[in-house]
Regions:
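Conserved donor NDP-sugar-binding/catalytic core segment of glycosyltransferases
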Residues: 93, 97-125
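N-proximal low-complexity "stem/linker" segments adjacent to membrane-targeting elements
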Residues: 1-28
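Membrane-proximal basic amphipathic "stem/tether" segments
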Residues: 217-274
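Cell-envelope/extracellular polymer assembly enzymes that use nucleotide-activated donors
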Residues: 4-7, 35, 168
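Short aromatic/hydrophobic "clamp" motif used to bind/position activated sugar donors
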Residues: 85
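Glycine-rich, basic loop-to-helix element that forms the pyrophosphate-binding segment
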Residues: 47, 63-80
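Conserved nucleotide-sugar donor-binding catalytic segment
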Residues: 115, 122-211, 216
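A conserved acidic beta->alpha catalytic loop
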Residues: 32, 40-49, 89, 93
């Protein structure tokens, strides 16, 4: 299986400062059995012109209004013919020029194959094994995740969600549909984005909680909360104050600062503990 066709999908909107480095990163890959798809949401900042400059490196692209990131990702998927899809959005870059060659040389057979992600010059691994605990606490990094095209076409991203549809897809595919999974110790991508806004993150957290409540019985959900975080006097206090909007925002912003200072080392450690 050393001639896998890899569909790389980039979605963007008014990303003229980031889109070129992403396209260039894809074009510079030594592995050439790539299908590159770019979905632009009708940008007005010059992004379209940059995409046109790289037309020879892109198999399909379009610039037109869409309904947001997940409709755009689904649109890109609908044009994919590869064995696997990977979503490298504007600003994301591959870790090295031979990343895709290394992935194909690893002989991927599983439905979902995950490598590692570079954040703030630190390599953050995806987990070796996936259980519900992963999705209660976090998710897999989509920039380092290769998904069977047939799988994502069967279960497309939920376009009613604004921030958590990729989490939902991975959770349902791996936990409820028992999709096969493998972690490979290969850094796949570099993530340099600033992350979601406070409002978008809040929406994503709400969507995750609503989906967990919808698909898990209450007592099982409570067990996972206890299993993942433990019930301590401190946690009980946090649960109470997190219900106060101003306090919740302070906690969220403080956590963001701490994680940046530590260069995501805490996140890396809990992955190792799984």
């Amino acid at each position: 299986m050393r001639s896998e066709l890899i569909s790389v999908i980039t979605v963007c909107y008014n990303a003229s400062k980031e889109i070129e480095k992403t396209i260039s990163s894809v074009a510079s890959q030594t592995y050439k059995n790539i299908e590159y798809i770019v979905i632009d949401g009708g940008s007005t900042d010059g992004s379209k012109g940059i995409i046109e400059e790289y037309n020879k490196n892109i198999d399909y692209w379009v610039s037109e209004p869409d309904g947001g990131i997940y409709p755009a990702m689904n649109k890109g998927t609908s044009h994919a013919h590869g064995d696997y899809c990977i979503y490298m959005n504007s600003g994301d870059t591959f870790y090295s020029k031979d990343v895709l060659q290394k992935v194909v040389d690893s002989n991927p057979k599983e439905d979902i194959v995950c490598g590692d992600l570079c954040i703030c010059d630190n390599i953050i691994p995806n987990p070796d094994e996936v259980t519900m605990k992963v999705f209660y606490r976090s998710t897999l990094y989509h920039q380092a995740t290769f998904i069977r095209t047939a799988l994502i076409k069967t279960y497309p991203y939920d376009e009613s969600m604004r921030s958590a549809a990729d989490w939902k897809f991975l959770m349902h595919s791996l936990i409820f549909h028992n999709a096969s999974y493998r972690h490979i110790n290969i850094p796949i991508a570099v993530f340099e984005g600033g992350g979601l806004s406070d409002n978008s993150s809040s929406i994503g957290n709400k969507e995750v909680e609503e989906e967990l409540q919808r698909c898990l019985p209450k007592r099982i959900l409570e067990d996972y909360r206890d299993y993942c975080y433990g019930v301590t006097p401190f946690r009980q206090m946090v649960n109470k104050v997190e219900g106060i909007p101003p306090v919740r925002k302070i906690i969220y912003n403080t956590n963001r600062i701490v994680l940046k200072v530590l260069n995501m080392k805490l996140h890396s450690q809990w992955i190792k503990d799984l």
